[in-house]
Amino acid sequence: KRDDQNQYLDFGKVVSMAKQSKPELRVIGWREWVGLPDLGIKKIKAKVDTGARSSSLHAFDLHEFEKEGVKWVRFKIHPLQRTAKRTIEASAEILEYRTVRSSSGATQLRPVIVTQVELLGIRWPVELTLANRDEMGFRMLLGREAFRRRFLVDAGNSFFGGQPKRKKKPKPKPNSKQQPAVNHTTSEP
């Protein structure tokens, strides 16, 4: 194409100008540790799923109640995968109920809440459906509506936000009842 002065346009400049008009998106992996500060969860491992539209949080023992005429839900969360040792209790206002189709094709009516999510130092509101994800690989699923226009997903990598520090297990103390070590070396006379 030519501009008004019959000169060729530099395609590289056009692409560069187009990139400048869009905010730069940060990259995240297909697995990330996210925080849900409003729910008291410092870190929960989430699967970043570009194939899922909505986001879901593992929740069980759901009890609905009214607070000043508004529907709320109280629930429990096991934030760590493959263990029920730690339980967090939380409550949130119910935004609505939504019919969600699982990856197996089954539909389920789930309560939807809005809460803050934190990833790579960025905090924003996200809609979460509450469902029992005990049998699923991840306690949280972050669907594309949650990260759209905020992040690009590198499906081949994980944990761009880092991983939480693991607590070191204390080394076992030597048992005082143990027999002293025997030296089996022999010396010749």
Show which residues each predicted segment covers.
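Short, Lys/Arg-enriched N-terminal segments with co-localized hydrophobic residues
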Residues: 1-16
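Pepsin/retropepsin-fold aspartyl endopeptidases
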Residues: 14-189
